[in-house]
């Protein structure tokens, strides 16, 4: 199975917290996890907006992209975006999230995110959460024991 990692999951990998995200990533074969160029753009923007630890953050992002390929956004992804935008036009949704969702659907892979609510009701999108307790738990209180893996859910 292949996975597209959302921005929050990439940040968890860079920070190494929560540990269950890294544990899950380690079970995959090389190339099974990818990120959208949209996620890469969000990570770059975050890096550009902050000044503390700039060199360290540059190295961390370079290391991440050396291990997790960045997929270009192509015509098929743009077509999926148009369909999703039309299907959910009355809902106020983040454009970057719509682009990431469309990208995952266009290549037929599961989107891994800790923001399941942000991706609810996207046509054809399959979502999986590798860090279900991360949003509700402070980093210092994250359990060392990884939770049971949730099966993918089609949303």
Where are these regions (language model features)?
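Short, well-structured N-terminal submotif of metal-dependent ribonuclease cores
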Residues: 1-35, 47-63, 133-139, 144-146, ...
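Alpha-helix/helix-capping structural signal
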Residues: 8-9, 38-41, 76, 117
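A general structural signal for well-ordered alpha-helical segments in protein cores
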Residues: 40, 58-61, 78, 97
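Amphipathic alpha-helical segments within well-ordered protein domains
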Residues: 44, 62-65, 82
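Active-site neighborhoods of divalent-metal-dependent phosphate/nucleic-acid chemistry enzymes
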Residues: 68-114, 141-155
């Amino acid at each position: 199975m292949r996975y597209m990692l959302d921005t929050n999951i990439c940040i968890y990998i860079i920070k190494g917290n929560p540990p269950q995200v890294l544990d899950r990533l380690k079970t995959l074969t090389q190339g099974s996890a990818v990120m959208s160029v949209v996620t890469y753009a969000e990570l770059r923007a975050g890096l550009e907006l902050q000044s503390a630890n700039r060199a360290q953050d540059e190295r961390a992002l370079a290391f991440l992209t050396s291990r997790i390929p960045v997929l270009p956004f192509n015509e098929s992804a743009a077509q999926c975006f148009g369909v999703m935008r039309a299907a959910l036009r009355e809902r106020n949704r983040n454009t970057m999230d719509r682009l990431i969702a469309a990208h995952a659907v266009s290549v037929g892979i599961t989107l891994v995110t800790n923001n399941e609510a942000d991706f609810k009701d996207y046509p054809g999108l399959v979502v999986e959460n590798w860090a279900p307790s991360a949003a509700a738990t402070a980093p210092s209180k994250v359990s060392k024991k990884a939770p049971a893996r949730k099966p993918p859910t089609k949303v």
